[in-house]
Amino acid sequence: MPLPDFHVSEPFTLGIELEMQVVNPPGYDLSQDSSMLIDAVKNKITAGEVKHDITESMLELATDVCRDINQAAGQFSAMQKVVLQAAADHHLEICGGGTHPFQKWQRQEVCDNERYQRTLENFGYLIQQATVFGQHVHVGCASGDDAIYLLHGLSRFVPHFIALSAASPYMQGTDTRFASSRPNIFSAFPDNGPMPWVSNWQQFEALFRCLSYTTMIDSIKDLHWDIRPSPHFGTVEVRVMDTPLTLSHAVNMAGLIQATAHWLLTERPFKHQEKDYLLYKFNRFQACRYGLAGVITDPHTGDRRPLTEDTLRLLEKIAPSANKIGASSAIEALHRQVVSGLNEAQLMRDFVADGGSLIGLVKKHCEIWAGD
């Protein structure tokens, strides 16, 4: 399929996707019943969409195009009520978190969808292992060239986004020692990590043509980069966050990305170059492994900075932009989180350290989601 022209969007508009866990009490393992839930709610959703993701234990909640985080929060809240009621009717529960702490990937059923079945044929067991749960945020752009500039700008802050959203310390019944273990699942995929370097939209079109020669790429949706342009929506999509445990934190993360995008495209503070990515995977690893306690390294100067310190600097820089787009509440909440030094991964570990089981942890996450 050829790459579509870049659809012009109103700059800084938002679209948010949350991949949720469908679990089966009282054992709180992943259920394989997302199709049943989708059928139950599809005629009751008035704004946004509830749909499949890769496997039958995943349920995606997606907003429509939103002006600001308040509109997005309203759509999510309405969807949440409908989904929770349908889940209760079918003796299921819903929760966030980037991984389910003890599910077995071999049990996961890939959705009966042409695209996902084709992906299963291409990637085999890797697709079942990709039963992990992330938050994706789309930001509208006025042109393809703006999208490429924004993608490179946001890529500088991938460690910050990962650390602030880290919520996947447990996997396959084990403490991984990572704050966010979810991104590691994709390391075996050929399109893992950052997009190959291009400097404008014309070069991106040439890149996509080259990738399509592999026959593994049918559309932009088949590319799973950390951040990717989405020409059919006219957006840049940030894909590195774990699904938070609460709607409020998900909305705050979206506000952070929207405000950062506004600052980047309004101020144009960077002259991007390929060398910017020289230490990308090392800095990304620091955020995945240590969360806000990680240390990032400047590829141009060699300077090393605590991620906590650099995140506070980012929040300060984007505060005026956040004020202009109605996202100040998100920046203030994230500032409090950074100062406290906590993320959801640490709260999960604290629960287990206090004697909680992994089954009890999932139950707690369901209670948190339902109560938010």
Curated annotation (Swiss-Prot):
**Which keywords does the record carry?**
ATP-binding, Ligase, Nucleotide-binding
The record's annotation in InterPro entries points to: GCL_type2/YbdK_subfam, GCS2, Gln_synth/guanido_kin_cat_dom, YbdK
Molecular functions (GO terms): ATP binding; glutamate-cysteine ligase activity
Which reaction equations make up its catalytic activity?
Answer: L-cysteine + L-glutamate + ATP = gamma-L-glutamyl-L-cysteine + ADP + phosphate + H(+)
Any one Pfam family match given in the protein's UniProt record, by short name: GCS2
Q: Which EC main class describes this enzyme?
A: ligase
Any GO BP: modified amino acid biosynthetic process
Q: What PANTHER family does this protein's entry cite?
A: GLUTAMATE--CYSTEINE LIGASE 2-RELATED (PTHR36510:SF1)
Q: Which family does it belong to?
A: Belongs to the glutamate--cysteine ligase type 2 family. YbdK subfamily.
NCBIfam families membership: gshA_cyan_rel, PRK13516.1
This chain belongs to which protein, by name?
Putative glutamate--cysteine ligase 2
